[in-house]
Design a protein with these regions (language model features):
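Active-site signature of alpha/beta-hydrolase-fold catalytic machinery across serine-
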Residues: 43, 126-127
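Residue in the alpha/beta-hydrolase core beta-strand immediately N-terminal to the catalytic nucleophile
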Residues: 111-113
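Serine-hydrolase catalytic machinery in alpha/beta-hydrolase-like enzymes
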Residues: 8-107
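Gly/Ala-rich beta-loop-alpha elbow adjacent to hydrolase catalytic centers
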Residues: 115-120, 124
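Class I SAM-dependent methyltransferase Rossmann-like catalytic core
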Residues: 2-4
Length: 127
């Protein structure tokens, strides 16, 4: 048996909290932990929301059912199977999210912060 890998285009999602505009002074990129989703994670960060802060929560590219097939799907950033490929794909995705969010923003007057929880922290440290 031979293993083959190919790169494919994948649709991924991320969530944001706040409004990115001329009042924005801080952008926070927040990466969820293992078996979470970006939207649920962002809910836990609502206390950081104010008119000067824009929070971006990318979601891990690998989804799965945490307990059974009737539960809501959750996500992870990597598994031990083809781990290096998962890491490479995640970094490519995070770079694209960063570029999309900051494309029309003058970052000279904006603090950009990075926050990761659990597996999100490990992913963040590689980014």
């Amino acid at each position: 048996m031979q293993k083959h890998n190919i790169e494919v285009l994948k649709t991924a999602r991320y969530f944001s909290l706040g409004t990115l505009n001329s009042q924005t002074k801080k952008i926070i990129f927040a990466l969820h932990g293992y078996a979470q989703t970006a939207d649920d994670f962002l809910e836990s960060l609502k206390s950081l929301e104010d008119k000067e802060t824009y929070i971006v929560a990318p979601e891990g590219l690998s989804r799965f059912y945490w307990k059974d097939f009737i539960s809501n799907p959750v996500a992870s950033w990597m598994t031990k199977l083809d781990r290096e490929d998962d890491i490479k794909d995640s970094l490519r995705y995070l770079n694209q999210v960063f570029k999309e969010v900051t494309n029309n923003v003058d970052l000279k007057n904006i603090d950009v912060e990075f926050f990761g929880f659990s597996q999100g922290a490990a992913t963040m440290s590689r980014w």
